[in-house]
């Protein structure tokens, strides 16, 4: 992107730092992927069996090709997990997280059958919004960037050109009028607030200006001497302690949707022209109610834009503000990447169809809004990318999946295989059994497994059958739980943890194939009605379900069926193919499969331990836990010089925030706060040991 060239991008190498080295199939997969990417192949598929370390292979691939990378995943939870893995593997590089910043989102819609208009309603997660800004900031200021994103990255975002044009460059010794800088900050949608200093605001104290950019947790202090910038510092917003001195810094706008006065006035003129044209069409069709409704709503929005520079739902006028022709694609995160970026699509069998489906789902809702006079036709240009537009914007692509779809297999010239697990574990043995007497057979298998302290997953086709089976097993003394759609997210995490710990032995569910579900204690997966063709018994679903038993040395899968369907045959053949390769490799290299030792802990455990430790430490400091003051999240960096009282207060505040984040299921934020609390407590203990607290 040409405008980004005026920013001095930091160029640092991608470097994987890990105690582990590539093992099993990983070295060969990394070498082949690297060769094919460097040879210019546009589409490459990595067929990686469950548990073979596809994420680590991706990190080593990025290290080899040294290119900015976008990793697309199917949902926010997996995006957070993957971002954390990459941060551990590439600690010196920028690993960013870009997902929808809505905790709750109800788009505006009109239901013609009942004449019901539903207003837009949403709640924005400020921490996720910061991470989105952090991603675009990183992409424009450095090359060593990995962005882990959901399909949110193909939805409209302000133009990178306007984002850069709205940026201000601060350089030590440069001439700059203080008042001009304040006006510039306001035009960038930062608010002056001398009392409540938080992200997205600035404050002024004489010749000193301080600002917290939208994408930062630390503040920037600019000290003037007349019309010259005398000093620039990065400082802690809570304690005011200077972290480091700076020579040059960029401050980007507080919103991705920035438009200068000239661009806004041109947009208003274009909106007025479209309104007049659309009213003519509606009136000619005798749609007088719709015409009046459109006139009132659009005129109100125009008045807001003229007076305030923005209006609610301004994104519906994005094509006019961007100056785009009707029907052309919106700008999105992909436009912030340099031309040579690499795209990695994780779990491509799910994510690729998801990308293609976004446009039609959005259009069906907006057509009603336009037809009934709630929006101008140009509102339909505020949309996700179409599939062909997405393809035009991406270059070389790596598809990752244990079960690649027909699309990606058709695009690539053969696939790269990653079948061998570093632990030597092999794919489970698949046994097909008749449906007659299946429940009694299942009960016998459960007793065999539980006697060896192993766990069992059972997957059924219907909610009714799952409930009846759970009741039947309970009646026969089996410790069993039922996982269904009514169980909330936090309880699901707890159920899986309790299964691993042995609180119960059997988990019954309808769709237990969830990609990324790690349960090493599970040695048997039983699939009831395996011969009933459909989504839950497709070859892809069956292979994913079989993978849930691949974490155990003695893993087995029992399919109960009276005939072998095409889906079953494909799933069994593929599993046996992988199993044969794995057994041959282990025999040749003298490898004895090792059980996967995955720590039984989740964020709820860690928070409880952290809380007990905090109470003990604060008691030793002569303090008691009080209510936190809800201060905005801050980093623990550079607090060595802070008094003990400040540290105690900060620990209390961050602990409150940690529990609030966990309660709202924001586990990534809770984990980060837990780590910051740990660092602060380490410093407080050192002060206590030295007799300063």
Curated annotation (Swiss-Prot):
The entry's keywords: ATP-binding, Cytoplasm, DNA damage, DNA excision, DNA repair, Excision nuclease, Helicase, Hydrolase, Nucleotide-binding, SOS response
Cellular component GO terms held in the UniProt record: cytoplasm; excinuclease repair complex
Biological processes annotated in GO: nucleotide-excision repair; SOS response
Domain annotation Helicase C-terminal: ranges: 438-604
Subcellular location(s) per record: Cytoplasm
Locus of motif Beta-hairpin: 101-124
Record: residues binding ATP: 48-55
Domain Helicase ATP-binding: 35-188
Pfam family, one: UVR
Residue ranges of every copy of the UVR domain listed in the record: 648-683
Gene Ontology MF terms in the entry: ATP binding; ATP hydrolysis activity; DNA binding; excinuclease ABC activity; helicase activity
CDD domains documented for this protein: DEXHc_UvrB, HAMP, SF2_C_UvrB
HAMAP family: UvrB
Subunit structure: Forms a heterotetramer with UvrA during the search for lesions. Interacts with UvrC in an incision complex.
Family: Belongs to the UvrB family.
Function of the molecule: The UvrABC repair system catalyzes the recognition and processing of DNA lesions. A damage recognition complex composed of 2 UvrA and 2 UvrB subunits scans DNA for abnormalities. Upon binding of the UvrA(2)B(2) complex to a putative damaged site, the DNA wraps around one UvrB monomer. DNA wrap is dependent on ATP binding by UvrB and probably causes local melting of the DNA helix, facilitating insertion of UvrB beta-hairpin between the DNA strands. Then UvrB probes one DNA strand for the presence of a lesion.
Domain-level remarks: The beta-hairpin motif is involved in DNA binding.
Protein name per Swiss-Prot or TrEMBL: UvrABC system protein B
Organism: Arthrobacter sp. (strain FB24)
Gene: uvrB
């Amino acid at each position: 992107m040409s405008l980004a060239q005026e920013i001095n991008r930091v160029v640092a190498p991608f470097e994987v730092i890990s105690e582990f080295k590539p093992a099993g199939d990983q070295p060969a997969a990394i070498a082949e992927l690297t060769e094919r990417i460097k040879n210019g192949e546009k589409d490459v598929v990595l067929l990686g069996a469950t548990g073979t370390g596809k994420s680590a292979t991706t990190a080593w691939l990025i290290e080899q090709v040294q290119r900015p990378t976008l990793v697309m995943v199917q949902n926010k939870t997996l995006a957070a997990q993957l971002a954390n893995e990459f941060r551990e593997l590439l600690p010196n590089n920028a690993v960013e997280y870009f997902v929808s910043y809505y905790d709750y989102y109800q788009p505006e819609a009109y239901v013609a059958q009942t004449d019901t208009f539903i207003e837009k309603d949403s709640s924005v997660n400020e921490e996720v919004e910061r991470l989105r800004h952090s991603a675009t900031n990183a992409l424009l200021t450095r090359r060593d960037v990995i962005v882990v994103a959901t399909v949110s990255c193909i939805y409209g975002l302000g133009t990178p050109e306007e984002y850069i044009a709205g940026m201000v460059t601060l350089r030590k010794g440069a001439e700059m009028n203080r008042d001009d800088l304040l006006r510039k900050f306001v035009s960038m949608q930062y608010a002056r607030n001398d009392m409540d200093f938080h992200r997205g605001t600035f404050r002024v104290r004489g010749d000193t200006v301080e600002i917290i950019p939208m994408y930062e947790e630390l503040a920037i202090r600019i000290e003037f001497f007349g019309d010259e910038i005398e000093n620039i510092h990065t400082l802690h917003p809570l304690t005011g302690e200077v972290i480091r001195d700076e020579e040059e810094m960029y401050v980007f706008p507080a919103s991705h949707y920035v438009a200068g006065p000239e661009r806004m006035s041109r947009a208003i003129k274009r909106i007025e022209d479209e309104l007049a044209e659309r009213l003519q069409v509606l009136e000619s069709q005798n749609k007088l109610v719709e015409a009046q409704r459109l006139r009132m709503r659009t005129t109100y929005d125009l008045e807001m834009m003229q007076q305030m520079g923005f209006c609610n739902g301004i994104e519906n006028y994005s094509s006019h503000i961007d100056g785009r022709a009707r029907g052309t694609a919106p700008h999105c995160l992909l436009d912030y990447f340099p031309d040579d970026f690499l795209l990695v699509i994780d779990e491509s069998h799910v994510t690729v169809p998801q990308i293609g489906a976004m446009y039609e789902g959005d259009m069906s809702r907006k057509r009603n809004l336009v037809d009934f006079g709630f929006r101008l036709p140009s509102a339909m240009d505020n949309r996700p990318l179409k599939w062909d537009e997405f393809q035009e914007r991406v270059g070389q692509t790596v598809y990752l999946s244990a079960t690649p779809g027909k699309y990606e297999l058709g695009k690539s010239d053969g696939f790269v295989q990653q079948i061998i697990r570093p632990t030597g574990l092999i794919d489970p043995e698949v046994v097909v059994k008749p449906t007659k007497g299946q429940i009694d057979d299942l009960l016998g298998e459960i007793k065999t497994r539980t006697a060896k302290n192993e766990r069992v997953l059972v997957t059924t086709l219907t909610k009714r059958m799952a409930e009846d089976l759970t009741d039947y097993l309970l009646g026969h003394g089996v410790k069993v739980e039922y996982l269904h759609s009514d169980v909330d997210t936090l309880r699901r995490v707890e159920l899986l943890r309790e299964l691993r710990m042995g609180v119960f032995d059997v988990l019954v569910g309808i769709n237990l194939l969830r990609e990324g579900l790690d349960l090493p204690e599970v040695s048997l997966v039983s699939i009831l009605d395996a011969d009933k063709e459909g989504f839950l018994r497709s070859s892809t679903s069956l292979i994913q379900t079989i993978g849930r038993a691949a974490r155990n040395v003695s893993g087995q899968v029992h399919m109960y069926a009276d005939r072998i369907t095409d889906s079953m045959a494909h799933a069994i053949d593929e599993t046996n193919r992988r199993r044969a390769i794995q057994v041959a490799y282990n025999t040749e290299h003298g490898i004895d499969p090792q059980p996967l030792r995955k720590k039984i802990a989740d964020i709820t455990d860690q928070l409880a331990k952290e809380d007990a430790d905090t109470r003990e430490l604060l008691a030793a400091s002569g303090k008691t836990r009080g209510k936190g003051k809800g201060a905005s999240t801050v980093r623990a960096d550079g607090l060595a010089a802070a008094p003990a009282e400040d540290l105690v207060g900060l620990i209390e505040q961050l602990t409150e925030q940690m529990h609030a984040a966990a309660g709202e299921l924001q586990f990534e934020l809770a984990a980060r706060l837990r780590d910051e609390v740990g660092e602060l407590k380490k410093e407080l203990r050192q002060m206590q040991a030295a007799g300063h607290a």
